[in-house]
Amino acid sequence: MFIMSKTLLEFNNLVTEFHTEGTTVKAVNDISFTLNKGETVGIVGESGSGKSVTSLSAMRLIPSPPGKISGGEIIFHKKNGEKVDLLKASEEEMRSYRGNDIAMIFQEPMTSLNPVFTCGDQVLEAIMLHQKIDKNQAIKLTIDLFKKVQLPDPERIYST
C-alpha cells in the first residue's frame, strides 16, 4: 500500500553564507523546519534576518559568488513519494522544479512584475518556460489561472 507523505519540503540544518571583503557572514545559520502539503507558512523576521535567503536557498538561486549554501539539506517530497535533496540536484533538475513544483512570491511587487509588460505576458512567459505547451494553450492556462485566483475580468487583465 502506498502512503502519501504529508511533508512537502524539509529544511534540515541549512547554512547559507556570503563571503565579502575578507569576512564570512552566515545569513542563515542552522535553520530547520518542515512545510506540509496544504500548509501556508509565513517566514517573519527583521530586515536582513535571512527570510529571503532561506527561500532563495530552496530554489538554489543564491548568487555565487559571493553566496554559498555551505551546509544542511533541503528535501523535496515529490508527488510520487520520491525524496530529492535539492542541494544535490542537477541544475537541469532544478529548472524543472522551479515554477512547476516550487515558486517564490516576493513581498515587493516591483520585483515581481515589470510595469512595462502586460501581466498576461509575464505570467505567459513563466508558463512557457516551464511547460511544454504552445502559446495558445499557455494563454488559455494564464487566463484560467487568473480566474482561479478570482481576479475580476481575467481576459482584460491578461492584456493590461
Task: Name what the model sees in each region.
Residues 2-160:
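ABC transporter nucleotide-binding domains
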